[in-house]
């Protein structure tokens, strides 16, 4: 049986998995891995902010 931990206290929801977690809807998905990778996939991705929209990393590649 799959081992998934869920903790909800009315303020926040925490879902934990040991190796990888995928949230999927149609062609869109968010994947979180144990190694710390976060993968966003979809036919259209939008990032919007009323304040600063910051991208930080060891290196950042656009296009």
What are these model-predicted stretches?
Residues 1-63:
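Right-handed beta-helix
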């Amino acid at each position: 049986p799959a081992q998934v931990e869920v903790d909800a206290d009315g303020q926040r929801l925490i879902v934990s998995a040991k190796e990888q977690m995928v949230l999927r809807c149609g062609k869109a998905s968010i994947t979180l891995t144990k190694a710390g990778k976060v993968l966003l996939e979809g036919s259209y991705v939008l990032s919007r902010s009323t304040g600063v929209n910051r991208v930080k990393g060891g290196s950042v590649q656009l296009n």
